[in-house]
Amino acid sequence: MKIAEIQLFQHDLPVVNGPYRIASGDVWSLTTTIVKIIAEDGTIGWGETCPVGPTYAEAHAGGALAALEVLASGLAGAEALPLPLHTRMDSLLCGHNYAKSALDIAVHDLWGKRLGVPVHELLGGALTDSVSSYYSLGVMEPDEAARQALEKQREGYSRLQVKLGARPIEIDIEAIRKVWEAVRGTGIALAADGNRGWTTRDALRFSRECPDIPFVMEQPCNSFEDLEAIRPLCHHALYMDEDGTSLNTVITAAATSLVDGFGMKVSRIGGLQHMRAFRDFCAARNLPHTCDDAWGGDIVSAACTHIASTVLPRLMEGAWLAQPYVAEHYDAENGVRIEGGRIRVPQGPGLGLTIDPERFGPPLFSA
């Protein structure tokens, strides 16, 4: 089956109860980029990519649209299958995984619909009918972080990510301590996420002053080299997030025992095809990981849920979705929802969504 047409859209996603605060800045509203692939037989596949602003990573909404215009212009008539698609995309544009991810998701959605099976079957098959999610507490005052931590634990979340950084390290230490005091004894897991916001000095101080708190340190510093520097001196397990930009980087980090796990985003690694390889590599190395994305609506949330359902449960650290911060669903009936800290795995064909073809207005680009 070949691609007949690709249409590109953009859509605003205001942050519910904003801002969402991380070390790189405050987020009030984001622009998501939507891909619609139409096959020769009229089957439609949807994809999506939504960077968290221009400073979180080397990605932004304007760049996504520009890259997708280049890719879409060269994909008419191409095979609508993941491997041929990636081969063709790589011949058209170097890098830009976050843009390629949207096309990858759309092709998986298209083929699932064509075959009448959910995307998770194309990825090897679901191991569960619901996936654990985790809640991310933005950078906030320590007392408020503790209050929200207990609230989310009572809602059913089994893991909390505490956003830290871009302020005195003493406040971050106070925040993680108060969060731990609030949820201690509940069995909830904690991740202290610096989002690249700490110096190596502050990351080491944070770990040394909290040896009694069982958290993992997620991407505390800015670079691969920073992680190498602090690794032998840390008192806590170390996870890679933003630096995990490719399969090659992941393989190197695991082979050198640099990290104990990963926070991985579908868009960062280039889509479900590459995420599947990442999943299998982590299973071979017995490394836990998440299945997330930076931001977005139902389309990218469904993609994350499908791949998360195929991960060995003992290695699955949860799927983070922006859904609690997004006011609307693209599909009011089948939109992805977090309930009791878990996400039901969609069972309909493709991503399991039924989206009105006119939902996002006229396309900004078509090829």
From Swiss-Prot:
One Pfam match: MR_MLE_N
Originating organism: Salipiger bermudensis (strain DSM 26914 / JCM 13377 / KCTC 12554 / HTCC2601) (Pelagibaca bermudensis)
One GO process term, biological-process aspect: amino-acid betaine catabolic process
EC number: 5.1.1.22
Residues forming the catalytic site: 163 (proton donor/acceptor), 265 (proton donor/acceptor)
GO molecular function term, any single one: magnesium ion binding
Family of the protein in this entry: Belongs to the mandelate racemase/muconate lactonizing enzyme family.
SMART domains assigned to the protein according to its UniProt record, in alphabetical order: MR_MLE
Annotated substrate binding sites: 56, 161, 294
Major enzyme class: isomerase
The keyword Zinc appears for this protein: no
Protein name (Swiss-Prot/TrEMBL): 4-hydroxyproline betaine 2-epimerase
Annotated Mg(2+) binding sites: 193, 218, 241
The record's free-text note on cofactor binding: Binds 1 Mg(2+) ion per subunit.
Role noted for this protein: Catalyzes the 2-epimerization of trans-4-hydroxy-L-proline betaine (tHyp-B) to cis-4-hydroxy-D-proline betaine (cHyp-B). Is involved in a catabolic pathway that degrades tHyp-B to alpha-ketoglutarate. This pathway would permit the utilization of tHyp-B as a carbon and nitrogen source in the absence of osmotic stress, since tHyp-B functions as an osmolyte and is not catabolized when it is needed as osmoprotectant. To a lesser extent, can also catalyze the racemization of L-proline betaine.
Reaction equations catalysed: trans-4-hydroxy-L-proline betaine = cis-4-hydroxy-D-proline betaine; L-proline betaine = D-proline betaine
Keyword entries, A-Z: Isomerase, Magnesium, Metal-binding
Cofactor: Mg(2+)
